[in-house]
């Protein structure tokens, strides 16, 4: 009996010692992992606010003193979030030294959302400077690094398509827009690739196809009452009907665009309105709208009156 009781005790002690050893290993791995994770609650707070309240996220990030003293993981996220917040708040990104901190930390080998975002915003920095080919390279890297198909991936494709379109590569631009649309199908954000697809058809003089996709884009914009996009699409309709010489319908759409657009957005709309009035042989109205658009042009670009 004693002999049989002795074995369980021995095994119990052995099991306990193994458990302690494994626990120590797991603890060290956990601590190692934690050392490379973000510690700043301000960064995590800014990250959580970024999509809906980018202005609040920017305020939080700008409140961080001495970001250069943050741990490496925190510095990388700070660089990424600050670039993202500036971009979302329409603030110039400047040079690429900030975002490169994030790019170097997150790398380009392992798929992760932050790695993809780092390369995307590096591309946005290049695009801001007019380096389209470098922007395309970084957008493609961002696509490769994205681990999931979501709205952010669709946005990358949409921006990639715009780059291709600028370079006159309409076929690959169309492919990128369609990929973005497939990812977003059924969501309100599909308005962007739909308008992009329509724009390519318009540039290829396929006006009926352009009208079809502009209508789909308009339907999406109306559902969410995106006034900026609604005004832009009304303007698109007016341009097509003006080219089709259907000046009555062109005037209807440009009038809708002007009603929806804000003062700063309406300069090109007033200029198109003047052209449509001229085509309708309403010369006094054409002169009125042409002269009306000039102060807006001057407000938006005080150094140039060439458009007026």
Task: Explain the meaning of each model-derived region.
Residues 2-32:
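Sec-dependent bacterial lipoprotein signal peptides
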Residues 34-308:
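A "functional boundary" signal
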């Amino acid at each position: 009996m004693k002999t049989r009781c002795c074995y369980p005790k021995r095994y119990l002690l052995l099991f306990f010692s193994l458990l302690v050893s494994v626990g120590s290993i797991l603890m060290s791995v956990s601590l190692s992992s934690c050392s490379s994770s973000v510690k700043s609650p301000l960064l995590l707070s800014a990250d959580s606010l970024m999509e809906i309240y980018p202005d609040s996220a920017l305020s939080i990030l700008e409140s961080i003193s001495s970001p250069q003293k943050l741990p490496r993981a925190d510095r990388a996220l700070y660089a990424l979030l600050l670039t993202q917040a500036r971009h979302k708040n329409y603030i110039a990104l400047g040079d690429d030294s900030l975002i490169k901190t994030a790019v170097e930390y997150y790398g380009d080998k392992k798929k992760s959302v932050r790695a993809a975002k780092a390369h995307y915003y590096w591309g946005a920095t290049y695009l801001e400077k007019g380096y389209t080919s470098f922007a395309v390279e970084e957008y493609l890297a961002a696509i490769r690094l994205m681990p999931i198909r979501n709205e952010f991936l669709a946005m990358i494709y949409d921006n990639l398509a715009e780059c291709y379109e600028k370079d006159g590569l309409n076929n690959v631009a169309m492919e990128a827009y369609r990929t973005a649309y497939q990812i977003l199908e059924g969501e309100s954000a599909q308005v962007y690739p739909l308008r992009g697809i329509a724009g390519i058809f318009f540039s290829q003089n396929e006006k009926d196809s352009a009208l079809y996709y502009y209508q789909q884009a308009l339907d999406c914009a109306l559902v969410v009452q995106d006034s900026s996009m609604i005004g832009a699409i009304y303007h698109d309709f007016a341009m097509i009907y003006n080219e089709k010489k259907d000046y009555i319908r062109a005037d209807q759409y440009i009038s809708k665009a002007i009603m929806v657009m804000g003062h700063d957005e309406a300069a090109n709309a007033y200029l198109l309105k003047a052209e449509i009035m001229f085509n309708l042989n309403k010369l006094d109205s054409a002169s009125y709208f042409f002269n009306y658009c000039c102060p807006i042009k001057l407000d938006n670009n005080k150094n140039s009156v060439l458009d007026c």
